[in-house]
Structures are given as C-alpha cells and as structure tokens.
Amino acid sequence: MKTRPVLDPKRIAPAAAEKLRSFHVEVVDEVVAAIAAHAVVVVGMAQNPHVKNVRKALNEAGVEFQYLAYGSYFSEWKKRLAIKQWSGWPTFPQVFVRGVLIGGEELTKAAIADGTLRERAERIEHAVSASGSAAVTA
C-alpha cells in the first residue's frame, strides 16, 4: 500500500508553524483532557451517521464512553479541522481507547467484533491499576 507523504516540518515557515500550533489549541486541550480522564472517548459531530453508528455499536457492546461533539456539517468546522490536524485522522468519529487512536466507525466496529477493543481497555486498565500510575501501554 502506498502511503501519503507528510510535509516535512523543515518546509514550514516559522510564522506558519506557529499558526498551526495555536489553531484552536483550546479544543485540542479539551480532547486531550478527555482522553486522559476516560477509558474510551468518541470525538464526533452532530448529524454524522458514522458517529451515530459507532456510538450505537459501543452502547450495544456495553462499552462506556465519553462523547465530545463539535458542531455539525454547518458549524464549528474549524474546531474539527484542528482535531484532525492534531490526530492525523481525516474523518469523524475518532475513537480513542486508553489514549490510543483506534480509528473511525469501520475500525471501531471491527475492534468490537473481534474483542480487541475490550481487550485493549482491560489489559491497559489492569496495568494501570496494578502499578497505580497513569502510564499508557499498548
């Protein structure tokens, strides 16, 4: 599979790099805080059927999750763009398990079906509770 190239940071002017780093930083901080505080986090938007489907699949699987919504197709697109730039994931939903991005609807449903979502959450949860630290292991 061919991979998409990523622009080398050396090819971004300092002023542009600063603009990228400060673009809706408060939104990214909110997502980072939720990921640190909750085992499973779904980042999405209103009216998006893929977000709705992944939330339904998690509910049906009995997986508790924190949901963060940023606008709809008609609002808050810049906030969603900041999240996409931060995570590198191009679409919504974005699902995180114990701090690890597992993907969107398709990959989340596959992880539910094959048990890897629950396994990841439980394996890491036990490692964290046994050590008493918040270190993330994959």
Regions found by a protein language model. Give the residues of each.
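Local sequence-structure signature of Cys/Sec-based thiol-disulfide redox active-site neighborhoods
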Residues: H24-L68
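Cytosolic beta-strand hydrophobic patch enriched in CBS
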Residues: V42, P93-F96
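N-terminal leader/targeting and pre-domain segments
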Residues: M1-A36, G132-A138
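Thiol/disulfide oxidoreductase modules built on the thioredoxin-like
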Residues: I83-T91
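Non-catalytic, surface beta->alpha helical segment in thiol-disulfide oxidoreductase systems
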Residues: V97-G132
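Short beta->alpha junction loops
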Residues: L68-F74
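Structural motif
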Residues: F74-L81
